Amino acid sequence: MSVIAITVFIVTYALIASDRVNKTLAALTGAAIVVTLPIINSEDVFYSHETGIDWEVIFLLLSMMIIVSVLRQTGVFEYVAIWTAKRSHGSPLRILLLLVLVMALGSALLDNVTTVLLIAPVTLLVCERLTINAAPFLMAEVFASNIGGAATLVGDPPNIIIASRAGFSFNDFLIHLTPIVIIVTVVLSALLPRLFRGAFAVDPERVADIMSLNEREAIRDRWLLIKCGVVLLLVFVAFIAHPVLHTGPSLVGMLGAGILIVISKLERSDYLSSVKWETLLFFAGLFIMVGALVKTDVVNQLARATTTLTGGHELLTVVLTLGVSTLVSSIIDNIPYVATMTPIVSELVASMPDQSHTDILWWALALGADFGGNLTAVGASANVVMLEIAKSAGTPISFWEFTRKGIAVTVISIALAGIYLWLRYLVMS
């Protein structure tokens, strides 16, 4: 069964990468095959935490899509778009750098998918006003999102899994991972002009038009904006405090979305029209296929085969953990991969001869899984959401267009992460 699961996954992945077949149709077809055979049964699909659909991700996405739909009715995205363009004096590069920094910071404090859903509409409006291609902006922002999400415990779901297994606190992530995230973000910002060379030309007349606009006139419903602001603030506080509240982000998001639906008194079409149902179905199909790989022990065997190559050598173990985490997380969702790897890393930590700085293996796992999401268009949930937003806005980004840029960003990010881990934990310690 493992051979069939691998074959179905590879064929489906190839179809998605070809951009010739609708990726949602490909994912659902692959999912239907592994369920029909049956490699994985309906009980596993709908109820298993290890092999089933990650409902936490699905409902978090749905709730934030609804919140963004309600927020869009206020005109606040137009306001922020005009404000950003004016403060940057219409310079596309300055706008991009500002949005990248906001995205990285936001993804450290919130789930990176949430940050993407909030910032992407602003980006599209800015680019529309300046009549420039939004694709480089969207790609740069999602790169920053995946990098920034590694900085804190709440920034990316794999960090929560690692923290639970290793006993790390919120402050542990701040102390150990935030420094390298800052370094990589700065390097990414410096790399962007070269990575997207020629994407920052703008018509001076469009800049003059932007500078003449009054952003306050963009607000259409101030009272609804105040309501949305209060609800969003409460949602964000609950996101950050969820380790204390023991409440999942999806439940918090759904409560926030439900409250906004009630108090906004909008028509159903106003808040459901912007929900990316196709994206949600794509994730469901992807989770089912990855679940089949987990169920047939493919992911576990891959992880164990990698660890046997290290022979207990500390530096080699770190390099392999970082490298394999990067590669595997670029192909399958990093959540099931990290969930599979944590018990193996725990065994490795216990078997290491030198117990003085074994935490390095956990940080290698976290950085590889988080940074590896930038390698391909399906490497992270935020990537898929951003590509769907771009497609809906009439600025489609192909799988290979994203991946070509993602390879450069990931290679540099992982190289810096490897040097950081080596210097901080194996040399300076």
Swiss-Prot record:
InterPro entries: Arsenical_pump_ArsB, Cit_transptr-like_dom, Diverse_Ion_Transporter. GO terms for cellular component: plasma membrane. Keywords: Cell membrane, Membrane, Transmembrane, Transmembrane helix, Transport. GO terms for molecular function: arsenite transmembrane transporter activity. The keyword Transport applies. The keyword tRNA-binding does not apply. It is a multi-pass membrane protein. It holds the Pfam family CitMHS. It is found in: Cell membrane. The chain crosses the membrane at residues 26-46, 51-71, 99-119, 173-193, 224-244, 279-299, 315-335, 360-380, 407-427. Belongs to the CitM (TC 2.A.11) transporter family. PANTHER family: P PROTEIN (PTHR43568:SF1). This is 46 kDa membrane protein. It comes from Mycobacterium leprae (strain TN).
